[in-house]
């Protein structure tokens, strides 16, 4: 017999070497949804402790970007890993469906409401458009491998959800948090509506930067305040600095800080009042060389001193405000109560009325002297001309600065006082309660707590009313004269909510007030406003979590969104839940950063660095996208590029190749009949299983702490170091050459089987498609579940027995020795002394500490070092230099004997058996005899 190929146990599996994910994943998805995988996961988890991750609804408009992919994949990894950790994890995806972006899109398609089509038809067009957008985004989320109740998502435009949003408004009213008032709010001229804090973006804008004189009504009074009677010469004025000249027509006061020192200063040929700390800066800005301090006083002493308006025929007082600082300007602040939050608050204390000069369209009303009918930004130059004309303009230049813009139109916005509905931060101690609740939440990363704490501490009252068509209406009736809410408001809200439940928000617009109010309809009218969309999404703790049966009345464990949501969804949810339930709506809040390219730049078409999620899964597969997400530290900016994705592909191939090796070497293994008990297994195999147990414990802990990059790193260490470059390399000889049903081989296959069962579960939350594929190739079991996703982490792993002399420390030491031997073998290969490692005979000269470890393996040490022969001698007898590993010296020679064509080991006994004259004695025992015996490796 000369052909011994059929006597070898060569690896064999149908599991392909190449993932070909882009092609295979859609078929797997079809199988998942044909067999209702999500419901199978839910059924398998029935009765277990619940973990609820409430999905923050993306906006139902436009195609998905990588930020969406990061968000949904992180959520999916959490839900799948929590299932594996023993939780029941219902996941209900949702969408935010009302609001301005959809209105604008629909306006472009069908025109504005009440122009070409009625408001009712316009709302239906918005509903249809949003539904279409949801379907498109849903298909993409599913393609990413995200499991959830996609057939029954929550939409904020669902009739039932709209009704619950109205009921939440009722609770806000019931608890005394709602009031109507005129306050400055962010106002978009293009939207003709107020904006929420989260709808404001800051972009650079060029604006006029001006210093303006307000002439003293009585110079003598001012001189006296500064103890400077008769000092200096020329006109005397208070100087303010502003970048919004258009707000000067609405000026009603000058604010100073009571605690600051102010000085009367001779600047050239005039006298001006400035904060002492800013005198030098203003002198430099005005480029005036002559300066003399005429007198000093505190802001407190200047209270109610009056100055002429720079171009109107009335005077304005100096008032005191804590918001005045010396960070810039002059230390005297132009105060227009209509156009600034601080201005409004401080003016209210002094009973100063708002001017009300700017209309909804951003133009000055017809009664405004000099500027009637002009747009506010157009009026800037006109105001400058007027200031020059009256001699009030001290200095003009143009500066580029950060300025608030509308998130949708990308155009500058203004602060404008309008009658709106607010949730008061101070009423019923809402701010104090919210700040207290923040402390009860686990924030991941931890800096999120300080961030939202500061935002809540400083935020103004929440303007929840909008002047829009497509939104949940503020279904209230107010008195025609007093603007007071109808006394039966709560009862009426519930009646309207029931109508909306059946017919949607159009039920409100179609409602005749007399139907509900009777005679009161003559003295009460409908509120025409809609709710801020952040009220919609912010109330989903009530409209979704408290209503959906799968959540069973449990409170939410986690909210997970991008870090911009501290001021968005996290904030609105916290405000509403605290206002209605006196508690935060979440126990944990996890935030991730934004996607940037490898140079840290934002994605933009102009830079050509935009990567679309579909581009990735169509080319590389969704598993590569998922692995990239899991591999990053999501707490900061998340870098992505084709190079980074290719790197994720390399990581993927290492994991896939490990899985393929495991499966190929389980060929012919039947766990029911071939499983070897741990105590009978060969030492190295027991150690390999214990390595898997250690890895699993670390992986479970990392999953539990949402440290997915740690999971990937631990997976790679296990696959590349502990398995790939050590264990799996060593066992090839035993796996391929020993008798097929020998203990030596079955012990090895038992280890491989345990490791495979564990590994497939480790990767399932991240590499979901690949895990599903591996699951189908594992050895059959009568009780094997159809899908890996219904399973918990594998509980069949075991550690080394305490009595086992060859413990983990032993094998870790051997791993180091083997790495050093490999280094020396590589040098011998480079020197052309040997080719493969099996052509070598290695003499290991070892110290007294290391030598006993090596000698414990006896003849089996050669299998660990993968050489044909190994001799161990005392280090003192070494005739070669000591190696890099202390206590070792290694000599490499060509192996004795001939190469066995079956096992490729060199042996001196080839030819001693006439019947098998070509192979070594070990192979003869494995082919003809009872099979070689192994104890250690």
UniProtKB/Swiss-Prot annotation:
Its main location: cytoplasm. This is Isoleucine--tRNA ligase. Catalyzes the attachment of isoleucine to tRNA(Ile). As IleRS can inadvertently accommodate and process structurally similar amino acids such as valine, to avoid such errors it has two additional distinct tRNA(Ile)-dependent editing activities. One activity is designated as 'pretransfer' editing and involves the hydrolysis of activated Val-AMP. The other activity is designated 'posttransfer' editing and involves deacylation of mischarged Val-tRNA(Ile). Keywords: Aminoacyl-tRNA synthetase, ATP-binding, Cytoplasm, Ligase, Metal-binding, Nucleotide-binding, Protein biosynthesis, Zinc. Belongs to the class-I aminoacyl-tRNA synthetase family. IleS type 1 subfamily. It comes from Histophilus somni (strain 2336) (Haemophilus somnus). Its EC number is 6.1.1.5. Coiled coil: none annotated.
């Amino acid at each position: 017999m000369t052909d011994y190929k059929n006597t070898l146990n060569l690896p064999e599996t149908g599991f392909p070497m190449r993932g070909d994910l882009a092609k295979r994943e859609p078929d797997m998805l079809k199988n998942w949804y044909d067999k209702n995988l999500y419901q199978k996961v839910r059924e398998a988890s029935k009765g277990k402790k619940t973990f609820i991750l409430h999905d923050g609804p993306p906006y139902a408009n436009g195609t998905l970007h990588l930020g969406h992919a990061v968000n949904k994949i992180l959520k999916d990894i959490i839900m799948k890993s929590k299932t594996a950790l023993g939780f029941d994890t219902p996941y209900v995806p949702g969408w935010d469906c009302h609001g301005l972006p959809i209105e604008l899109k629909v306006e472009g398609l069908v025109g504005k409401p009440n122009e070409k089509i009625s408001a009712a038809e316009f709302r239906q067009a918005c509903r249809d458009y949003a539904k279409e957008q949801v379907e498109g985004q849903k298909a993409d989320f599913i393609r990413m491998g995200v499991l959830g109740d996609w057939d029954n998502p929550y939409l904020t435009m669902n009739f039932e959800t709209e009704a619950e949003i109205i009921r939440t408004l009722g609770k806000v009213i019931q608890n005394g948090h709602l009031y109507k008032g005129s306050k400055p709010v962010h106002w978009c001229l293009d939207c003709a509506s107020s904006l929420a804090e989260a709808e404001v973006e800051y972009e650079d804008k060029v604006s006029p930067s001006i210093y303006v004189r307000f002439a003293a009504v009585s110079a003598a009074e001012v001189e006296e305040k500064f103890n400077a009677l008769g000092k200096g010469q020329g006109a005397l004025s208070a100087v303010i600095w502003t970048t919004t000249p258009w707000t000067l027509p609405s000026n009603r006061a000058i604010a100073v800080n009571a605690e600051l020192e102010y000085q009367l200063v001779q600047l050239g040929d005039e006298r001006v009042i400035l904060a002492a700390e800013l005198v030098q800066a203003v002198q430099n800005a005005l480029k005036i060389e002559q300066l003399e301090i005429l007198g000093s006083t505190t802001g407190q002493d200047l209270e109610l001193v009056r100055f002429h308006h720079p171009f109107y025929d009335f005077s304005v007082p100096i008032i005191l405000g804590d918001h005045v600082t010396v960070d810039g300007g002059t230390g005297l602040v132009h105060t227009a109560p209509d156009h600034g939050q601080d201005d409004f608050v401080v003016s209210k204390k002094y009973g100063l009325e708002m001017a009300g000069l700017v209309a909804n369209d951003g133009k000055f009303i017809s009664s405004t002297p000099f500027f009637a009918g002009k747009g506010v930004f157009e009026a800037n130059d006109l105001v400058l001309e007027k200031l020059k004309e009256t001699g009030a303009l001290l200095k003009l230049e143009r500066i580029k600065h950060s300025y608030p813009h509308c998130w949708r139109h990308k155009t500058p916005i203004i602060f404008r006082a309008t009658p709106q509905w607010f949730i008061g931060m101070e009423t019923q101690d809402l701010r104090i309660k919210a700040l207290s609740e923040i402390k009860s939440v686990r924030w991941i990363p931890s800096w999120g707590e300080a961030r939202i704490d500061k935002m809540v501490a400083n935020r103004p009252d929440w303007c929840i009313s909008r002047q829009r068509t497509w939104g949940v209406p503020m279904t209230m009736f107010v008195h025609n004269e007093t603007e007071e809410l109808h006394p039966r408001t709560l009862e009426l809200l519930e009646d309207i909510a029931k109508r909306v439940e059946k017919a949607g928000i159009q039920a409100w617009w179609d409602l005749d007030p007399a139907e509900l109010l009777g005679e009161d309809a003559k003295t009460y009218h409908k509120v025409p406003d809609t709710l801020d969309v952040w009220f919609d999404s912010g109330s989903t703790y009530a409209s979704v979590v408290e209503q959906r049966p799968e959540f069973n009345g449990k409170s939410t464990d986690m909210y997970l969104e991008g870090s911009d949501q501290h001021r968005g969804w996290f904030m609105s949810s916290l405000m509403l839940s605290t206002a209605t339930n006196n508690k935060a709506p979440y126990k944990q809040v996890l935030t991730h950063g934004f996607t940037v390219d490898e140079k840290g730049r934002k994605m933009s078409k102009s830079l050509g660095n935009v990567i679309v999620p579909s581009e990735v899964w169509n080319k590389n597969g969704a598993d590569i996208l998922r692995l990239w997400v899991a591999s990053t530290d999501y707490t900061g900016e998340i870098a992505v590029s084709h190079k980074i994705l290719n790197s994720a592909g390399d990581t993927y191939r290492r994991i896939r190749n490990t899985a393929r090796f495991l499966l190929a070497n389980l060929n012919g293994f039947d766990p029911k009949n071939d499983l070897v008990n741990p105590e009978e297994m060969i030492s190295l195999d027991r150690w390999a299983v214990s390595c898997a147990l250690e890895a699993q414990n670390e992986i479970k802990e990392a999953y539990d702490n949402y440290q997915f990059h740690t999971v990937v790193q631990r997976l790679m260490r296990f696959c590349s170091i502990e398995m790939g470059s050590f264990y799996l390399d060593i066992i090839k000889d035993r796996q391929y050459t020993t008798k097929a049903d020998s203990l030596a081989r079955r012990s090895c296959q038992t280890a491989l089987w345990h490791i495979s069962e564990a590994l497939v579960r480790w990767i399932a939350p991240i590499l979901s498609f690949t895990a599903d594929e591996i699951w189908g190739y594992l050895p059959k079991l009568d009780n094997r579940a159809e899908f890996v996703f219904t399973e918990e982490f594998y509980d069949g792993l075991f550690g080394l027995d305490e009595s086992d002399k060859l413990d983990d420390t032993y094998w870790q030491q051997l791993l180091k020795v083997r790495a050093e031997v490999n280094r020396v073998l590589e040098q011998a290969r480079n020197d052309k002394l040997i080719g493969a490692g099996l052509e070598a005979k290695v003499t290991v000269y070892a110290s007294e500490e290391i030598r006993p470890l090596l000698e414990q393996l006896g003849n089996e040490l050669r299998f660990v070092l993968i050489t044909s022969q190994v001799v161990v001698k005392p280090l003192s007898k070494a005739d070669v230099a000591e190696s890099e590993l202390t206590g070792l010296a290694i000599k490499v020679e060509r192996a004795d004997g001939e190469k066995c064509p079956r096992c490729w080991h060199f042996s001196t006994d080839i030819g001693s058996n006439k019947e098998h004259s070509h192979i070594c004695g070990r192979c003869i025992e494995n082919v003809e005899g009872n099979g070689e015996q192994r104890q250690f490796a």
